Amino acid sequence: MFDLFSNVLFTNGDVKNPMDVNVTSTMCSVCGSRSAFFFRPYSGETLCQKCFISSIEKKVQTTIAKYGMFSFDDRVAVAVSGGKDSISLLHVLTKMDRTHPKASLVAVTVDEGIRGYRDEALAIAEENCGKLGLEHQIVSFKELYGFTMDEIVAKSRLKEGKKLTPCAYCGVLRRKALNVAARRVGATKIATAHTLDDEVQTMLMNIFRGDISRLVKEKPLTDEVHSRFLRKVKPFCEIPERESTLYAYVKKVSFQDVPCVYSNEAFRNEVRSMINRMEALHAGTKFTVFKFVERMRHALGATLEKENFVDCVDCGEPASSGLCRACELLKQIRCI
């Protein structure tokens, strides 16, 4: 497991360092007036807590501007799972009013219905939204689909032959639920907390699978392909996962640190381990992969045909054929 805190130099009592690294006298390379607690291998910086927090917030502002993620009057639905990344993103985006004073935020959480896991996450999301004074919309699988995730998993395990993983069902159903919930609250865009690590892992997985279409589509700001598909933005796409986590610790915000009981994507875990080993040996590898794919996307996109959508015959949402993918999966579950 790649340790998220391996670059923490020391603690002054505010941040617990699980590695128990000895205290050093290194000074912050930005302000020069406070002791550093974090070393950034890819930039060579040593940062104090204040400059670290400032660097994350400035980087997100730069990323938003770089990709033109927000319009001046956007209503942004922030996908909040209750985990470290989504909670960190929520707190960073509340500062957006400095640059986008007419924009507004609303938090959206999808309740998949996973007993012993989602209950805690919902409470944490609600707590953070309350502290930030944000509206919080919750949409559940049970309400939308008639099944909880626990029920879907139980039924899918009765299926004969090749079975989809719980993550395969959940990913499709969550994306649809998030889009529906965001439209309900009048959002114009959806912000997700995909970090640099998430993006690079997905890029490599798509390359290994030869999936050019997904490689092109999954941009920091997705294209507008249908009026009922809200565009998604990824303000954390250039923030390493360990820095998103450390931001939450330094800010002392509550988040869920227990992994989902169904999370077991073997392929993603293999890719994660590989890219983390490369990053440890060659600092900046993740940024290099990310920037390379970003440069390739425009050229690759020209080779793809434009998607045509029809209305799903079951739910009326946009679909590439008679049934949208979510309704296809639900139909399979109902037939078991």
Predicted regions and their residues:
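ATP-dependent adenylation/nucleotidyltransferase module used to activate substrates
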Residues: 2-217, 238-251, 324
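Flexible helical/loop "lid" subdomain adjacent to adenine-nucleotide binding pockets
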Residues: 57, 65, 75, 189, ...
